[in-house]
Structures are given as structure tokens and as C-alpha cells.
């Protein structure tokens, strides 16, 4: 599986190259959950993504983040509702309002990148950006759920 440090490097490349926000996922253009989906295709071959059963469907990724039972055939392999006891880990997916029209996904990066303490990387209308979690939540409401994403090794 892809190490978290490799996942972070691919996300950082998107930010450095100033990828744009777009519902059509392609090189240089991704929507919010597209930052995860595109890194899976980038790291693994298309046939490997299929063999790993990594879904390319946005709604499926959102919905699996909030169901009581984790579906191992979906992208989120471990998850929960965010509360005061949630321990954020670098590379963890964060979900906001997964069932609403304004649902959103970001990746928690914490202090992985210099100059940030408690940050997320996300694709928003301004493109792929890193900003403090508190700033993202102040603009768009708090994230409600977290999940460990399929294809990523969180042990490193």
C-alpha cells in the first residue's frame, strides 16, 4: 500500500502545480474527493485500482464515511463521527455533511508541511490548497466524520 508520506507528496505536488477545482477529474483538475481518487490512479495502475476495489464514485465515498457498517468494497476502511475524543492522524480523510448538497472532503495533514500546525489539504474553488483546519471549518462549517482511506498505509 501507498505510505502516508507518498500520499502527502502527491497531494503537495497538486498544490505546487496549482491544480484547479473541477468536477471532472483529470491531470491538473480535481474536485474535493478527486484529490484522493486521483492519487490512487497516480500511484496504482488503473487495473490495480480496480483489483483493490477502490471506488471512483464520489457519492459512494461520502456515504461509506457515515454508515454504521464499513463496506470493505468502498474507499473508507475505518471511520467514525468526529467528537472531542477524535485523534486526527496525518492522511486521514475528513468529511463534512456527506449527505448534503454541500458535502466536502479534505485530507488532514496536521503539521506535515512547514508553516502549518493543524492543517488540511483540500480542493476548493480556488484550487488545491493547504490551510489550517480551523480556517476551513470557519468558512464552511465543521467536518463531521473521519475515515482511513483504502490503499494508504497509515502505519508509517
Cite the ranges covered by each PLM segment.
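Intrinsically disordered, low-complexity N-terminal regions enriched in serine/proline/glycine
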Residues: 20, 35-42, 61, 66, ...
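...with weaker cross-activation on analogous glycine-rich loops/strands in unrelated enzymes
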Residues: 46-135, 141
Amino acid at each position: 500500500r501507498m505510505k502516508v508520506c507518498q500520499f502527502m507528496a502527491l497531494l503537495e505536488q497538486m498544490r505546487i502545480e496549482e491544480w484547479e477545482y473541477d468536477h471532472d477529474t483529470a491531470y491538473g483538475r480535481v474536485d474535493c474527493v478527486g484529490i484522493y481518487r486521483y492519487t490512487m490512479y497516480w500511484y496504482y495502475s488503473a487495473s490495480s485500482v480496480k483489483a483493490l476495489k477502490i471506488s471512483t464514485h464520489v457519492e459512494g465515498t461520502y456515504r461509506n464515511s457515515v454508515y454504521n457498517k464499513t463496506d470493505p468494497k468502498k474507499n473508507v476502511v475505518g471511520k467514525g463521527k468526529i467528537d472531542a475524543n477524535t485523534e486526527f492522524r496525518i492522511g486521514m480523510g475528513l468529511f463534512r455533511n456527506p449527505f448534503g448538497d454541500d458535502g466536502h472532503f479534505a485530507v488532514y495533514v496536521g503539521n506535515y508541511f512547514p508553516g502549518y500546525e493543524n492543517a488540511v489539504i483540500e480542493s476548493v474553488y480556488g484550487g488545491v490548497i493547504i490551510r489550517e483546519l480551523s480556517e476551513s471549518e470557519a468558512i464552511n462549517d465543521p467536518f463531521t466524520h473521519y475515515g482511513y482511506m483504502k490503499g494508504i498505509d497509515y502505519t508509517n
